[in-house]
């Protein structure tokens, strides 16, 4: 090592701990009041700037045991799982197993001759199939699910409305796994996740990892974990830790090495809502950056999830928006998640909590953290 290189290494060794401490103070100022406001037992905040990752753990994984949150603590990520399912479909497409242009009925013989002759995989991947949000309560097995799909009739033409849908992304996950000739969980855990280098991300948490699985808490402080049900794995089934999830965001920023089959990421513009709040990509939502906090809150509020919004296809699809705020919320009964990355800034933030609290507060917290990161 030359004298100049030794000096550079010494300077870096002195600067990095100071920068980390300053970043910790910025994040403390945002997260500690938020945890107090909602009585959140534990959180993990993962930050990446130019590929340099830091994990900031807060509180406990279980109020009963008092075990602290660490970077290995597993959280339910809720609907952030939908982005993994969309990525699995891209993973299958890269192997020439499917095409997003094809109708869903091309891959599912049980729904041929139904409304799905006119619903493309791209519609399923962008919440524009018209399918409703929830699987009906009386649908409890695959036969009943397929019967529901066969009988379903859309209220609007495919592509004309954005309707946030577990049923839509669930069908896409079924098709992606079928095209790979594997059960969904196997395709995810043994195929795509290893290709991403995510070794502590699961649909089914193995026995050896249960000690790392945080206890979730409902808004009224009851201990809860996600319940099994039709399309749960495809829609909201992922459990992961802060280290794996910030790697996932960095992969979207192309800041980490992944297997060659996993080098294209599902961020391409495909549909925009006429309300103008955001552009809908393959499960990720994006906003031109810089963006006002009020616009982010509008796009992530409950109304955008529960109510349909007119949508217009962008044709041809545009290149990815580098100056964009890409985000996705995720919730289960006892966990809260918010993920955001900004390609033009090479910044990513992942927020994980073992208690449910509103999206607005998650978005605002991440917004202030990113503002602080940009000032450093």
UniProtKB/Swiss-Prot annotation:
<feature type="active site" description="Acyl-ester intermediate">
    <location>
        <position position="79"/>
    </location>
</feature>
<dbReference type="GO" id="GO:0046677">
    <property type="term" value="P:response to antibiotic"/>
</dbReference>
<keyword id="KW-0378">Hydrolase</keyword>
<comment type="function">
    <text>This protein is a serine beta-lactamase with a substrate specificity for cephalosporins.</text>
</comment>
<dbReference type="InterPro" id="IPR050491">
    <property type="entry name" value="Bact_CellWall_Synth/Modif"/>
</dbReference>
<keyword id="KW-0574">Periplasm</keyword>
<dbReference type="InterPro" id="IPR012338">
    <property type="entry name" value="Beta-lactam/transpept-like"/>
</dbReference>
<feature type="signal peptide">
    <location>
        <begin position="1"/>
        <end position="21"/>
    </location>
</feature>
<feature type="active site" description="Proton acceptor">
    <location>
        <position position="164"/>
    </location>
</feature>
<dbReference type="InterPro" id="IPR001586">
    <property type="entry name" value="Beta-lactam_class-C_AS"/>
</dbReference>
<keyword id="KW-0046">Antibiotic resistance</keyword>
<feature type="binding site">
    <location>
        <begin position="328"/>
        <end position="330"/>
    </location>
    <ligand>
        <name>substrate</name>
    </ligand>
</feature>
<dbReference type="GO" id="GO:0008800">
    <property type="term" value="F:beta-lactamase activity"/>
</dbReference>
<protein>
    <recommendedName>
        <fullName>Beta-lactamase</fullName>
        <ecNumber>3.5.2.6</ecNumber>
    </recommendedName>
</protein>
<dbReference type="GO" id="GO:0030288">
    <property type="term" value="C:outer membrane-bounded periplasmic space"/>
</dbReference>
<dbReference type="Pfam" id="PF00144">
    <property type="entry name" value="Beta-lactamase"/>
</dbReference>
<comment type="similarity">
    <text>Belongs to the class-C beta-lactamase family.</text>
</comment>
<dbReference type="GO" id="GO:0017001">
    <property type="term" value="P:antibiotic catabolic process"/>
</dbReference>
<dbReference type="InterPro" id="IPR001466">
    <property type="entry name" value="Beta-lactam-related"/>
</dbReference>
<keyword id="KW-0732">Signal</keyword>
């Amino acid at each position: 090592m030359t004298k100049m290189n030794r000096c550079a290494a010494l300077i870096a060794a002195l600067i990095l701990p100071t920068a980390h401490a300053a970043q910790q103070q910025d994040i403390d100022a945002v997260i500690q009041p938020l945890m107090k406001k909602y009585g959140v037992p534990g959180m993990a905040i993962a930050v990446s700037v130019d590929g340099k990752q830091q994990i900031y753990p807060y509180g406990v994984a279980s109020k009963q045991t008092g075990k602290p949150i660490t970077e290995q603590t597993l959280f339910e990520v809720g609907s952030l799982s939908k982005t993994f399912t969309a990525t699995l479909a891209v993973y299958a497409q890269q192997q020439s197993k499917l095409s997003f242009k094809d109708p869903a009925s091309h891959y599912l013989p049980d729904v041929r001759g139904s409304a799905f002759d006119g619903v493309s995989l791209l519609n399923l991947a962008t919440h524009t199939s018209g399918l409703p949000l929830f699987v009906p309560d009386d649908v409890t097995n695959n036969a009943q699910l397929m019967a529901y799909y066969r009988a379903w009739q859309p209220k609007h033409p495919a592509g004309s409305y954005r309707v946030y849908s577990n049923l839509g992304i669930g069908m896409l996950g079924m098709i992606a796994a079928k095209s790979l000739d594997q059960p969904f969980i196997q395709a995810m855990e043994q195929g795509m996740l290893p290709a991403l280098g995510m070794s502590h991300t699961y649909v089914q948490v193995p026995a050896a990892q249960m000690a790392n699985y945080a206890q979730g808490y409902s808004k009224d402080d009851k201990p809860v974990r996600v319940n099994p049900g039709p399309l749960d794995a495809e829609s909201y089934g992922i459990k992961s830790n802060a280290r794996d999830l910030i790697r996932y965001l960095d992969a979207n920023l192309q800041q980490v090495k992944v297997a060659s089959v996993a080098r294209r990421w599902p961020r391409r513009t495909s549909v925009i809502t006429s309300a103008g709040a955001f552009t809908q990509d393959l499960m990720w939502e994006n906003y031109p950056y810089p963006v006002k906090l009020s616009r982010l809150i509008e796009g992530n509020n409950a109304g955008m999830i529960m109510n349909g919004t007119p949508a217009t296809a962008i044709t041809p699809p545009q290149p990815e928006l580098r100056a964009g705020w890409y985000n996705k919320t995720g919730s289960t009964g006892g966990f809260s998640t918010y993920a955001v990355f900004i390609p033009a800034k090479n910044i990513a933030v992942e927020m994980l909590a073992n208690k449910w609290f509103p999206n607005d507060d998650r978005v605002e917290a991440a917004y202030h953290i990113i503002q602080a990161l940009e000032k450093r």
